Regions:
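Phosphate/oxyanion-binding active-site loops and adjacent basic polyanion-contact surfaces
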Residues: 69-74, 103, 143-144, 166-167
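Conserved AMP-binding loop of ANL adenylate-forming enzymes
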Residues: 82-124
C-alpha cells in the first residue's frame, strides 16, 4: 500500500543505510487505532503476539505489536550489566508503570533471563497525568504515596531483592520514604539500579549518587545506570557516568537493531556536528518493525563513539524545545 506512494522502488533501490533517507518520515499517529494486525509481518503472523501501548491519557493510544523484540532488547541490555552489582539469580523490583506497557514485561523478562524473579507494583501513569492536568495535587501526592508504599512493602517483605528498575522521580520518593522509616535503599539490600526517564539530568544524577546513595559506587555499593528508550526504539545504554565528566549522560542505541542520529532542526536528513544540538531521529530495523526515520519528541547533543559502543551517541536528552512547554512528564 505504501509502496505505491513512493517515487522509488524500496525492493531494489535500498542497498545501504544512507538509502533509507529516501523514505518519508514515519508518523507515529499511524499507530493509533486498529486493526493492529496490519503491523504484523507476514513471516511472523503465526507467532504469539503482544500489543503494547504508549500515551493514551486522552484519546486513542498508540499501539505497537511485538513478538520477541522486547525479549531480545533486554537480553542484549543484560550483557551490559555488571554482575557484581546485578547478581545473577537475584530478584528484582519493577518500580514503574504497569498495565499495557512494554516496560513491565521487559523488566520481568530481564529478571528471568538473569535467573531471578520480578516483583512489581500497580501504577497507572495515565491517571498521574490526568491528576497533574486537573491540578489535583492532593490526590497526586496520595497516589504517589500509594505507589511508594507498595514498593516499600515488597522491599521489606524478605524477598531478597537486590536489583530494580525505577524512574528518577519514583526512585527519589522511594529513598525518602525508606529514610522516613529509619532505613535506606542500601540497607534494604539494593545493589543495582537501572533507571530511565526525561528527568535524568547530570544535576539529578549527582544529587542521587551523593545524597540518596551516600557516595559513588565504590563507597555506597550501589551501581546505577541510566537508559533511554521507548516502545519503538527498545533500549539505549549509557556510557559510564562519572564525577570526572560532571555526571554527563550519553546514550548509545542498540545498533544495528536501532540507530539514533542527532539531526538539524531544519533538515532531518542532515546530521549535526559532534557537540552540536539537534533533534533525535530514530531508525528501527528489526525483523518485527521497520521504521525508516522517526523524529522523536526529544533533542540533545551529538556524541562521539567510544570503545564499548563504536557509533554515535546523544547526550543532554530533553523534550524538543518547540513542544517542551506542552509536555506533561508524569511519572517519567
Amino acid at each position: 500500500e505504501k509502496k505505491s506512494e513512493l517515487n522509488f522502488d524500496p525492493l531494489t533501490e535500498v542497498n545501504s543505510f544512507e538509502d533509507l533517507r529516501k523514505f518519508p518520515l514515519f508518523e507515529d499517529e499511524w499507530l493509533r487505532g486498529g486493526p493492529v494486525r496490519r503491523w504484523v509481518p507476514k513471516g511472523l503472523e503465526n507467532e504469539p503476539t503482544y500489543v503494547f501501548e504508549t500515551g493514551g491519557t486522552t484519546g486513542i493510544p498508540k499501539s505497537r505489536v511485538v513478538m520477541r523484540d522486547h525479549w531480545r532488547d533486554y537480553e542484549m541490555f543484560s550483557h551490559t550489566l555488571p554482575d557484581e552489582y546485578f547478581p545473577k539469580g537475584s530478584n528484582w523490583l519493577m518500580l514503574g508503570p504497569s498495565g499495557p506497557r512494554r516496560l513491565r514485561l521487559a523488566v520481568e523478562h530481564l529478571a528471568q533471563y538473569r535467573g531471578g524473579i520480578s516483583f512489581c507494583i500497580d501504577l497507572d501513569p495515565r491517571w498521574v497525568v490526568k491528576l497533574i492536568k486537573k491540578g489535583w495535587m492532593e490526590h497526586l501526592e496520595e497516589y504517589k504515596k500509594h505507589c511508594i508504599d507498595q514498593a516499600v512493602t515488597v522491599l521489606t517483605a524478605g524477598h531478597d531483592i537486590k536489583c530494580m528498575f525505577a524512574t528518577p522521580k519514583l526512585l527519589d520518593q522511594l529513598c525518602t520514604a525508606l529514610e522516613e522509616r529509619g532505613t535506606s535503599i542500601k540497607e534494604v539490600g539494593i545493589t543495582g539500579i537501572f533507571s530511565g526517564g526525561t528527568e535524568f539530568t547530570p544535576q539529578w544524577t549527582r544529587y542521587c549518587i551523593e545524597e540518596l546513595f551516600g557516595g559513588p559506587t565504590e563507597q555506597s555499593g550501589i551501581y546505577m545506570t541510566p537508559t533511554y528508550g521507548n516502545t519503538l526504539m527498545g533500549l539505549a545504554c549509557s556510557k559510564p557516568v562519572t564525577a570526572e565528566e560532571k555526571y554527563k549522560i550519553s546514550y548509545y542505541a542498540p545498533q544495528p537493531r536501532a540507530v539514533v542520529e542527532v539531526v538539524s532542526f531544519d533538515d532531518h536528513n542532515e546530521v549535526v556536528g559532534y557537540g552540536d544540538t539537534g533533534r533525535v531521529k530514530l531508525t528501527t530495523l528489526t525483523d518485527e518493525l521497520f521504521i525508516p526515520g522517526f523524529l522523536e519528541r526529544d533533542e540533545g547533543e551529538r556524541e562521539e563513539p567510544f570503545e564499548t559502543f563504536p557509533w554515535d551517541g546523544v547526550s543532554g536528552v530533553r523534550p524538543f524545545h518547540e513542544i517542551a512547554q506542552s509536555t506533561t512528564v508524569g511519572v517519567y
